[in-house]
């Protein structure tokens, strides 16, 4: 089985998000890469589930809160952009201040 670079990147994101969720379930606060992985994964899955870009921009702010991340992470993550595949093509999802 051969994967394109984009497919490999998506698989790595799934693995990173899974590891971050496991750490979160153990009561650990998430660091910057873990928070980005979880939010990115949830946005990509939302697109796959048929949500609109507008719905995902709003949903992106509900995935994690300041209590879920280490001190300073919310301040560092002021904007996220991720390209997702929708039924009508690939679109950019931008979430401003994803951790509130």
Curated annotation (Swiss-Prot):
| Segments crossing the lipid bilayer | none
- For the keyword Chloroplast, the answer is no
- What Enzyme Commission number(s) does the record list for this chain? 3.5.1.5
Q: Where in the cell is it found?
A: Cytoplasm
Instruction: Kindly state one GO CC term assigned in the UniProt record.
Output: cytoplasm
Family annotation (CDD domains): Urease_gamma
Its pathway is: Nitrogen metabolism; urea degradation; CO(2) and NH(3) from urea (urease route): step 1/1
Task: Print the keywords alphabetically.
Answer: Cytoplasm, Hydrolase
Reaction(s) catalysed (UniProt annotation): urea + 2 H2O + H(+) = hydrogencarbonate + 2 NH4(+)
Q: Which top EC class is named for this enzyme in its record?
A: hydrolase
Q: Name one GO molecular function term.
A: nickel cation binding
One Gene Ontology BP term is: urea catabolic process
Task: Please give the InterPro entries that the UniProt record associates with this protein.
Answer: Urease_gamma, Urease_gamma/gamma-beta_su, Urease_gamma_sf, Urease_subunit
Signal peptide: which range, if any? none
**Is Manganese set as a keyword in this record?**
no
Q: Which Gene3D superfamilies match?
A: Urease, gamma-like subunit
Query: Can you tell which superkingdom this protein's organism belongs to?
Result: Bacteria
Major place of localization?
cytoplasm
Q: Which family does it belong to?
A: Belongs to the urease gamma subunit family.
Record text on subunit structure and interactions? Heterotrimer of UreA (gamma), UreB (beta) and UreC (alpha) subunits. Three heterotrimers associate to form the active enzyme.
What PANTHER family does this protein's entry cite? UREASE (PTHR33569:SF1)
> What is the name of the protein in this document?
Urease subunit gamma
